[in-house]
């Protein structure tokens, strides 16, 4: 079974998020979504506090039938711990990260099989 994972705060869930998540789900057998509780914990100068509560964002993601599991996390270290703990085959990133560094890149390289896949967010 091919397990995929993606991470975000998913605040104000929109068609771009849904398109990216659907595309990720179509490219794995089991999709885990890491839901960041508050991006300002690690990056207060570059990120905004979520408008929606964690419960609201979780409920919206949970309504998407192609998501198999939602794992809330707080910090970038938590994200790294999740990548180390779970048996992940592919890490999905939105197209905006195509040329950027991303958290956990070293883990992806170290584990060999875990690779990054950039998915295009289409408004379907």
Q: Residue spans of the language-model regions?
A:
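Nucleotidyltransferase catalytic core that binds NTPs
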Residues: 1-124
């Amino acid at each position: 079974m091919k397990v995929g994972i993606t991470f975000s705060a998913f605040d104000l869930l929109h068609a771009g998020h849904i398109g990216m998540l659907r595309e990720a789900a179509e490219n794995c057998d089991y999709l885990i979504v890491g839901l960041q509780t508050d991006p300002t914990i690690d990056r207060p100068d570059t990120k905004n506090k979520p408008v929606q509560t964690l419960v609201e964002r979780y409920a919206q993601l949970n309504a998407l039938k192609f998501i198999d599991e939602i794992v809330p996390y707080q910090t970038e270290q938590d994200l790294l711990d999740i990548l180390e703990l779970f048996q992940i085959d592919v890490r999905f990133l939105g197209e905006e990260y195509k040329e950027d560094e991303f958290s956990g890149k070293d883990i992806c390289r170290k584990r060999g099989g875990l690779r990054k896949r950039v998915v295009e967010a289409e408004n379907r």
